[in-house]
């Protein structure tokens, strides 16, 4: 698959060949769903357990006599009705993450990239380097590219410092290094923008 390489100013340059094994697959909704669900559950923190009546460190002696006291019947002070007692039906410790085979994770990334490429939502630019790290100037450049409400920029080993500074306050603009490319961020972006370095890194990562 060939695609035009642009600049941040919107000027077209030479073509670049994209590996069909990475950018030419047919996306499957079930694979993308599995990977996104795995990602979201992986970043979710574990549930903290509350202490129930068996976990509370209080005496187990019966509180008062069973009959003749003129008050309600009680067992011990660990009951949920008392201040300092255990929680009734409280949450238990639980982790929400589950495992997913590396081959499925890699396949999901390939399909997410392929979906953007086939849908015309993939843009390849030469570099993210800016002469001046000015937010206003960058916003003007991106407005000419018509990237939609949410754009994801992926660079090589690291996002260029000038672009990272200029785009930090732009709503709907996210930037990641190639190592941080993931299915969730790619799928939710309207447009995916890759640099030449990012294309090389992603192809090496997916075929490695």
UniProtKB/Swiss-Prot annotation:
One family name in Pfam for this protein: Ribosomal_L4
Single GO term (MF): rRNA binding
Keywords, in A-Z order: Ribonucleoprotein, Ribosomal protein, RNA-binding, rRNA-binding
One Gene Ontology cellular component: ribosome
Cystine connections: none
Gene3D superfamilies: 3.40.1370.10
Statement: the UniProt record of this protein carries the keyword rRNA-binding: yes
Domain of life per record: Bacteria
Cross-referenced HAMAP family: Ribosomal_uL4_B (MF_01328_B)
Purpose of the protein: One of the primary rRNA binding proteins, this protein initially binds near the 5'-end of the 23S rRNA. It is important during the early stages of 50S assembly. It makes multiple contacts with different domains of the 23S rRNA in the assembled 50S subunit and ribosome. Forms part of the polypeptide exit tunnel.
Family: Belongs to the universal ribosomal protein uL4 family.
Quaternary structure annotation from Swiss-Prot or TrEMBL: Part of the 50S ribosomal subunit.
Name of the molecule in the record: Large ribosomal subunit protein uL4
Protein's organism: Sphingopyxis alaskensis (strain DSM 13593 / LMG 18877 / RB2256) (Sphingomonas alaskensis)
Classification lineage: Bacteria, Pseudomonadati, Pseudomonadota, Alphaproteobacteria, Sphingomonadales
Gene that encodes it: rplD
């Amino acid at each position: 698959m060939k695609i035009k390489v642009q600049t941040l100013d919107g000027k077209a340059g030479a073509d670049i060949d994209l590996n069909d094994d990475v950018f030419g697959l047919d996306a499957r909704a079930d694979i993308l769903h599995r990977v996104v669900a795995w990602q979201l559950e992986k970043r979710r923190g574990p549930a903290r357990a509350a202490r129930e009546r068996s976990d509370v460190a209080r005496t187990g002696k019966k509180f008062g006599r069973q009959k003749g006291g003129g008050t309600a019947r009680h067992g011990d002070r660990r009951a949920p009705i008392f201040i300092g007692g255990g929680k009734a039906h409280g949450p238990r410790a639980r982790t929400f993450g589950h495992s997913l085979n590396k081959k499925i994770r890699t396949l999901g990334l390939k399909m997410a990239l392929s979906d953007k490429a086939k849908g015309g939502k993939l843009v390849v630019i030469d570099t993210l380097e800016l002469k001046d790290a000015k937010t206003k100037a960058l916003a003007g450049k991106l407005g000419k590219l018509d990237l939609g409400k949410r754009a994801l920029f992926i660079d090589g080993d690291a996002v260029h410092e000038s672009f990272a500074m200029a785009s930090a306050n732009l709503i709907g603009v996210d930037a990641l290094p190639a190592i941080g490319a993931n299915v969730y961020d790619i799928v939710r972006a309207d447009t995916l923008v890759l640099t030449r370095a990012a294309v090389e890194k992603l192809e090496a990562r997916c075929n490695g």
